[in-house]
Amino acid sequence: MKAVATVFICGSLVLITYLPLVVTSPQTLAIPEKLRQAVGRVVVNATACSVTCGLGYKEETSCEVGPDGVRRDCRSQRLECLTNWICGMLHFTIIQRQQFELNCLSSDILTKGQEAFRFTWKLARGIISTNDELFKPFRANSPFLRFKPAYESDSGTYRCDVQQLKNLKLVKRLYFGLRVLPPKLVNLNFQQSLTEDQKLAEEGWEVHLDNQSQPHLPGWRKKVSLALGVGIAAGVVGGVLVNVALCRVLGGTGGNGNLSSL
């Protein structure tokens, strides 16, 4: 048994040693003459997709390449491309009774024609979310949703799905987060919503909003403020000294007059 095992191991080693030589021999790798003369069309250049999400287009150039590596009969064509069909969410905040429109179209869809696509809308009423389990069908088959006007009950998340009619392939999904606010509930005036420190910062003052410290003037304004402070202080001190001097003079004059009368 030991002898048989030894012979088997030695035979395996010999086979492993000579197998690469057999595989790489010219006879094994011989290429037929017809295959050597074959010509194939390969893509030599392609642009990126025109959009990052949804249906887009790209330019592709292909050429015939032979055994000599020379490119012949090159052609360029415009092809559809789809990088990602989920296009995120757009947020909108409007006032009640304001006319508004949600638009699911894109330039590439307009180029091909919206009649080649199917538009389906769904709504998650009253919340802003991308959880597809919360959406219910919304009766609309147009690429637009128009609110004439919008009411608070129209708030929610609207989902637009775009499919190609030729194969019902989903090529785009876009979410719209819509908030409709009563006019008396909130004032959207930006300036009126600022705090005192924020207003000072808007006017050019150096304000540390993170630690709620007192506002600091810029360098040139600090110098002006310092000069004004020194001037005011000097004026006050000078006025006090003048008053003291006048009081002494008037006091001395009054005393001399009294002595003269005596």
Swiss-Prot record:
Residues 1-30 form the signal peptide. GO terms for biological process: sperm-egg recognition. Residues 83-171 form the Ig-like domain. One of its GO terms (molecular function) is protein-macromolecule adaptor activity. Disulfide bonds join 104-160. InterPro entries: Ig-like_dom, Ig-like_dom_sf, TMEM81. Its main location: membrane. Essential fertilization factor required for male fertility. Part of a conserved trimeric sperm complex with the essential fertilization factors IZUMO1 and SPACA6 which bridges sperm and oocyte membranes during fertilization by binding to IZUMO1R/JUNO on the oocyte. This is Transmembrane protein 81. The gene is Tmem81.
